[in-house]
Curated annotation (Swiss-Prot):
InterPro entries: C2_dom, C2_domain_sf, C2_Freud, CC2D1A/B, CC2D1A/B_DM14. The C2 domain mediates interaction with monophosphorylated phosphatidylinositols PtdIns[3]P, PtdIns[4]P and PtdIns[5]P, and is required for membrane interaction. C2 domains can mediate membrane interactions in a Ca(2+)-dependent or -independent manner; the l(2)gd1 C2 domain lacks three out of five asparagines that are crucial for Ca(2+) binding. The C2 domain is required for protein stability and cytoplasmic localization, and is essential for l(2)gd1 function. Contains 4 tandem repeats of the DM14 domain that mediate interaction with the ESCRT-III complex component shrb. The 4 DM14 domains show functional redundancy, particularly domains 1 and 3, however domain 3 is necessary and sufficient for l(2)gd1 function. DM14 domain 3 forms an alpha-helical hairpin loop with a positively charged surface patch that binds a negatively charged surface patch on shrb. Residues 231-254, 414-425 have a biased composition (Pro residues). This is Coiled-coil and C2 domain-containing protein 1-like. Interacts (via DM14 domains 1 and 3) with shrb; the interaction is direct and blocks access to the surface involved in shrb polymerization. This interaction may be required for the ESCRT-III complex role in multivesicular body formation. It comes from Drosophila pseudoobscura pseudoobscura (Fruit fly). Residues 143-201 are annotated as: DM14 1. Residues 25-47, 86-100, 110-130 have a biased composition (Acidic residues). Residues 256-314 are annotated as: DM14 2. Residues 1-11, 73-85 have a biased composition (Basic and acidic residues). Residues 1-136, 157-263, 414-486 are annotated as: Disordered.
Length: 814
């Protein structure tokens, strides 16, 4: 009934244990087998077991006990560990510390075998072992380069501190600290990357005006550093120190040497003036010395420097300043040249400065074109477009200059390194300035031009240029201060004109005094003194009205010479003097009425400023009218007068209306085309559109027995100016007026014609006043209707009326 269960087949493992990191067990492993079959080696195992059980086995060697340190040495070590030792003192002798080097080599895997140590320890008792020297991992060349750079940076920092350049001194100090850290690491045997070593800088020996020869930098290819160091052989105790290869020296920069030489001359001159008590000249020379520092730094950084603008020697500098200021040359005291300073070398030929406005514009145009081309080469489209606009601006300026048209020089940007544009006429040269680089112009120092109306202005030394003889002017010591700021040519021209006019009156006063005309000389002197306030205003940048300047004496003489002097008998007396007086009185009365009406109009509008303006004008006209009436009454000659053209801007406003009122005036009808013109009775219906399809409707009274009636009726409509829907009504719709003729008994009224008045003109005007043809659809039926529509102010803008008046003005008596 029940079948016997079949044995299951042995399952095979799908995975082996090796892939899980375990030892593979074979499938036929039998734990009971394997030991009984092995007959060899049992006696050896039993003997070993017996030896272990009896304790007769060989005992392991006992480790030697460490020697106990004496108590005195232990106290000394504790005191040394508690003492605060600076890092600099700890790292001074790391290079020759054999213990540390040995530990370093031990860490690197260079420990000696124990057998070698034991073998070396045995003969140590009999004879002293020679000292081994462990070599650092840093090569001798790298260590020598670091030491060499340390000396260079120390000297450069000292020179920078001596010259007062704090920024350069701080920079050299940071490089010196980096070199000191690298030197400590190299002495400790650490690997140093050559790229981490600060670059070499050019220094000059102390006390020598010319810079020392620049030493060539270290080789750019880094020296391959060994990862492991071979054990040092027991050779001599003091190995010879390897010296770094001498770096080839580069020739000195002649520009820096020349500028240093000239700077030392100015320093000596400033010191000489300071000792002699001349502080002003000492400060002047000291400012030039400061400018030299900026340009020397630019030259040392590799920027291009032009020596054409280098100041002259100190002996010629003050003389050049005196020539520019218009002072006498004998007052200039030449500065003594310092004896230790060598004679400066002659400067190389420099590019000639622009002598005319056209050349200056061309040079600036070429500069901006080169910058634009560089930007295009770099694919910097934004910069290229920006400089392209500047190039176009300069090209237009050159075209205008060639065509003789005025050019707005103030709007032209000035590239870095370029001074202000030269004026059209020779102007006083600027104070000598140091050469500037096209990339970074040096900052200018400000000084004061004493004794001149122009006040203080910035001075920078420039190349001395010969100036044409001109009247004494305030010394212009201003040059370009920022990239887009330069002095206005208009201001310079005004300044020059004022000085020339002042000089003319001074000369005229002297000549009048010599001729014995004391009163005339006093008058000219007063005018001469009055120019001081104008000069101060012009030098401060304020505009000056040149039309108010007094006429120079030379032009006065020419003006008087152009008229023929006649006697009273040669002139025919005029018979219409009384008529002229009457016309003058009428004209002044008309002007007075106009001023009063306009004053009242502005008062009704609430314009207080306009009211005051016309009030004052009315007072002036009233005074003139009183003078004319008084002269007529007393029989005196009429005062001198002249006519002027005056422009008045009057805001038109219907002040009798409010802002939310519109007035419709039906004035009259003109020649209606009706069959019975003398018996017709007419009236007008008015319809004005409002919001929400509503409308204002009214009608006039009936005018009987005429076809040209005078209605003269006014209707006021309330409007909403601020409502946009109501504003659209003014734009699209109009006032509808229908003219009716009253019918007889049992007859309805007859429509004569229709008039539509558009309201759109009220957006910009206050009034609509016109006559309109009567229409039947699109056909004219004959006759017209006069209509006027008014609002207080236009819907959108103010209505300003420009009035040109021929104004009668009485001359003031001198």
């Amino acid at each position: 009934m029940f079948a016997k269960r079949k044995p299951e087949p042995a399952k095979r493992r799908q995975h082996n244990l090796a892939q899980f990191g375990l030892t593979e067990i074979p499938d036929d492993f039998d734990p009971t087998s394997g030991y009984g079959d092995d007959d060899g080696g049992d006696s050896d195992l039993e003997a070993e077991l017996a030896a272990l059980a009896s304790g007769g086995g060989q005992r392991p060697k006992a480790k030697p006990k460490p020697k106990l340190m004496p108590t005195s040495d232990l106290d000394k070590m504790i005191a040394d560990s508690l003492r605060d030792v600076s890092d600099d003192d700890d790292d001074e002798n790391l290079e020759n510390d054999s213990d540390l080097l040995g530990e370093l080599h031990g860490i690197g895997g260079l420990e000696e075998e124990p057998e070698a140590e034991e073998a070396a320890a045995e003969p140590a008792a009999s004879e002293e072992e020679p000292v081994q020297t462990f070599l650092p991992t840093t090569t001798v060349d790298t260590l020598g380069i670091i030491k060499q750079r340390l000396e260079i940076y120390k000297q450069a920092e000292a020179n920078a501190k001596a010259s007062g350049d704090s920024g350069k001194a701080r920079r050299f100090g940071r490089g010196l600290k980096t070199l000191q850290d690298l030197h400590k690491q190299a002495a400790a045997g650490k690997t140093i990357n050559v790229d981490d070593i600060p670059p070499e800088v050019s220094v000059k020996p102390a006390g020598d005006p010319s810079p020392a020869a620049d030493e060539s930098p270290a080789p750019s290819t880094p020296v391959s550093q060994p990862t492991r160091v071979a054990p040092a052989p027991p050779t001599p105790t003091s190995p010879p120190a390897a010296t770094p290869p001498p770096a080839p020296a580069t020739p000195p920069n002649p520009l820096v040497a020349q500028m240093r030489s000239r700077q030392s001359e100015y320093k000596a001159a400033a010191l000489q003036y300071k000792r002699s008590g001349d502080t002003a000249n000492a400060l002047q020379f000291l400012k030039v010395v400061k400018q030299f520092d900026v340009v020397v730094k630019m030259c040392e950084d590799g920027q291009e420097v032009d020596l054409s603008d280098m100041p002259p020697p100190p002996s010629e500098f003050l003389e050049f300043l005196a020539k520019m200021k218009g002072e006498a040359a004998p007052e200039v005291v030449t500065a003594p040249e310092p004896t230790p300073a060598p004679a400066p070398a002659t400067p190389p030929a420099a590019a000639a400065a622009a002598e005319s406005m056209l050349e200056a514009l061309q040079r600036r145009l070429e500069k901006y074109k080169s910058v634009e081309a560089a930007a295009k080469a770099e694919e910097n489209t934004g910069k290229a477009r920006r400089f392209g606009r500047i190039v176009k601006q300069y090209e237009d300026a050159i075209k205008q200059y060639k065509a003789g048209k005025p050019v707005a020089y103030d709007e032209l940007p000035v590239p870095p390194g370029f001074g202000p544009l030269p004026s059209t006429e020779p102007a006083p040269a600027a104070t000598p300035s140091l050469p500037t680089s096209p990339t970074s112009p040096p900052a200018t120092a400000s000084t004061s031009a004493g004794g001149t109306p122009s006040g203080s202005s910035a001075t920078t030394p420039t190349v001395p240029r010969k100036a044409a003889p001109s009247p004494p002017q305030p010394t212009e010591l201003t040059t370009r201060v920022t990239g887009n700021h330069q002095k206005s040519n208009l201001a310079e021209q005004q300044m020059k004109l004022l000085l020339e006019r002042q000089k003319e009156f001074k000369v005229a006063a002297i000549e009048a005094k010599k001729a014995g005309e004391i009163d005339q000389a006093k008058e000219y002197l007063k005018i001469y003194k009055g120019f001081d306030s104008l000069l101060n205003a012009a030098s401060s940048g304020l505009p000056v009205d040149l039309s108010t300047l007094p006429v120079p004496p030379s032009q006065r003489d020419n003006l008087e010479a152009s008229f023929a002097i006649v006697s009273a008998e040669e002139c025919d007396p005029s018979d219409d003097i009384c008529e002229i007086g009457v016309r003058m009185e009428e004209q002044l009365a008309k002007q007075l009425m106009m001023c009063k009406n306009t004053r009242d109009h502005h008062k009704a509008m609430g314009d207080v400023a306009g009211m005051n303006r016309f009030e004052n004008l009315a007072l002036t006209v009233q005074k003139d009218l009183d003078v004319v009436r008084y002269s007529k009454r007393k029989g005196q000659p009429l005062p001198k007068f002249h006519y002027e053209k005056r422009n008045f801007n009057i805001v038109h406003c219907n002040t009798d209306l409010t802002d939310n009122e519109l007035e419709i005036v039906v004035a009259r009808g003109i020649n209606y085309n009706v069959p019975n013109p003398k018996e017709v009775d007419t009236y007008v219906r008015v319809e004005f559109p409002l919001l929400n399809d509503e409308s204002f409707k009214t009608k006039t009274n009936v005018i009987k027995d005429t076809n040209s009636p005078d209605y003269d009726e006014r209707f006021k409509v309330d409007i909403q100016r601020s409502n946009r829907q109501f504003q659209r009504i003014f734009k699209r719709h109009g006032v509808k007026l229908e003219i009716y003729s009253r019918g007889g008994f049992l007859r309805s009224d007859i429509l004569i014609g229709t008039v539509n008045v558009k309201l759109q003109p009220l957006e910009t005007k206050c009034d609509i006043h016109d006559t309109y043809d009567l229409m039947d659809g699109r056909k004219q039926v004959g006759g017209k209707l006069e209509v006027k529509v008014r609002v207080r102010n236009p819907i959108l803008t103010k209505q300003i009326e420009h009035i040109n008046e021929k104004w009668l003005v009485l001359d003031a008596e001198g």
